[in-house]
């Protein structure tokens, strides 16, 4: 059905247009700012539906999770862990930190020992991760990690960060990942956590390693696209700001309650 446009309607539309043009001409900057602000608010609502803004941390945080943490490496340089642990905003505090320990065959993060010690001393739960290099034999990488990290009771299980395949097929990558996981589990007595991005997971790892806990990176989503993955941790942003840390830092949530977090740390299997 087509609407008939009368002369009166045409006149009204013309007057409205002239009025808008006059406002823009008289207040150009204010008009642009108004429309920009409105557009930003609409965009924020679309992108962050299910999130809530937390001003001090400079990001939106998923609203339905209560346990928050960060992950750090040499890129954050020297961290003031006392300030990190004291930070609070709107009932949100940081309860855990994943810390890069090693990478590939030889690389040990230069800040690992300091971060590992001070995060625990300031009351945060801590976990150590190894960045997996597909070009290096898995046993070599596992030994480097185990020689570097001194686990204590109350620490998270070891974490394997798998983000690249290199020249390997997906099948060969999974074989090497499995070798690392089994070696580290045998040594530590706990099943390691596997970290990966959502896209890489779907392409290379989906349907495998279901017996292991997962930590998935997927930004600006209401929930991570997990394709049936039983994820424990979700890295939802890489732009957080935290007292005591220079620059941006990754933010994560734990998928569970305080009791489930403690059971996870203790290595207690939940009753189905």
From Swiss-Prot:
The active site is at 163. Coiled coil: none annotated. Keywords: Glycosidase, Hydrolase. PROSITE patterns: GLYCOSYL_HYDROL_F25_1, GLYCOSYL_HYDROL_F25_2. SMART domains: Glyco_25 (SM00641). GO terms for biological process: carbohydrate catabolic process; cell wall macromolecule catabolic process; peptidoglycan catabolic process. The keyword Chloroplast does not apply. The gene is yegX. Belongs to the glycosyl hydrolase 25 family. It comes from Escherichia coli O157:H7. One of its GO terms (molecular function) is lysozyme activity. This is Uncharacterized protein YegX. It comes from the Bacteria. InterPro entries: Glyco_hydro_25, Glyco_hydro_25_AS, Glyco_hydro_fam25_subgr, Glycoside_hydrolase_SF.
């Amino acid at each position: 059905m087509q609407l008939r446009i009368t002369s009166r309607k045409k006149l009204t539309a013309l007057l409205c247009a002239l009025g808008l043009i006059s406002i823009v001409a008289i207040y150009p900057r204010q008009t642009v700012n108004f429309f920009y602000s409105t557009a930003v608010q609409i965009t924020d609502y679309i992108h962050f539906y299910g999130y809530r803004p937390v001003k001090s941390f400079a990001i939106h945080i998923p609203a339905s999770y209560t346990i928050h943490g960060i992950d750090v490496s040499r890129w954050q340089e020297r961290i003031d862990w006392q300030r990190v642990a004291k930070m609070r905003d709107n009932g949100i505090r940081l309860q855990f930190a994943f810390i890069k320990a090693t990478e590939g065959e030889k690389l040990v993060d230069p800040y690992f020992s300091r971060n590992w010690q001070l995060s625990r001393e300031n009351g945060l739960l801590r976990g150590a991760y190894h960045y997996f290099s597909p070009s290096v034999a898995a046993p070599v990488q596992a030994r480097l990690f185990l020689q570097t990290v001194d686990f204590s009771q109350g620490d998270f299980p070891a974490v394997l960060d798998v983000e690249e395949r290199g020249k390997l097929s997906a099948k060969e990558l999974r074989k090497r990942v499995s070798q690392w996981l089994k070696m580290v589990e045998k040594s530590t007595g706990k099943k390691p956590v596997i970290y990966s991005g959502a896209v890489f997971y779907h392409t290379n790892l989906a349907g495998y390693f279901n017996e292991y806990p997962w930590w998935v990176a997927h930004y600006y989503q209401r929930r991570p696209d997990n394709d049936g993955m039983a994820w424990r941790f979700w890295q939802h942003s890489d732009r957080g700001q935290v007292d005591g840390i220079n620059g941006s830092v990754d933010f994560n949530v734990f998928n569970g309650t305080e009791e489930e977090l403690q059971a996870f740390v203790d290595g207690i299997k939940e009753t189905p």
